[in-house]
Amino acid sequence: MAFKREIHGLVVKKAGDKTATILVERRVMHPRYRKFVKKFKKYLVHDEKNAVKIGDTISAVECRPLSAKKSFRLKAVLKAGVE
């Protein structure tokens, strides 16, 4: 089986039925100043059971493209948010 990329992020939006938007933070070193800088990116995640809420921290795994912008499936809810 091929390696599947796994991402962890914070749910920032419930975008329609069975879809959530998560914000993923990564830290990269600036090439000139050698300081770690936070970079952010949003991903659309498929949530089959509509189980996540805004503020949850989740884990998602890469899958085949489910729509034009959605290529991740919900794996687990790591920490429940406050909503």
Swiss-Prot record:
Domain of life where this protein originates: Bacteria
Gene Ontology, cellular component aspect: cytosolic small ribosomal subunit
GO biological process: translation
Record carries keyword Ribosomal protein: yes
Gene3D superfamilies assigned: Nucleic acid-binding proteins
Keyword field: Ribonucleoprotein, Ribosomal protein, RNA-binding, rRNA-binding
GO molecular function terms attached to this record: rRNA binding; structural constituent of ribosome
Record keyword Ribonucleoprotein present: yes
InterPro entries in the cross-refs: NA-bd_OB-fold, Ribosomal_uS17, Ribosomal_uS17_bact/chlr, Ribosomal_uS17_CS
Role description: One of the primary rRNA binding proteins, it binds specifically to the 5'-end of 16S ribosomal RNA.
Subunit annotation: Part of the 30S ribosomal subunit.
HAMAP family the UniProt entry points to: Ribosomal_uS17_B
Entry similarity comment: Belongs to the universal ribosomal protein uS17 family.
The protein's name: Small ribosomal subunit protein uS17
Recorded name of the encoding gene: rpsQ
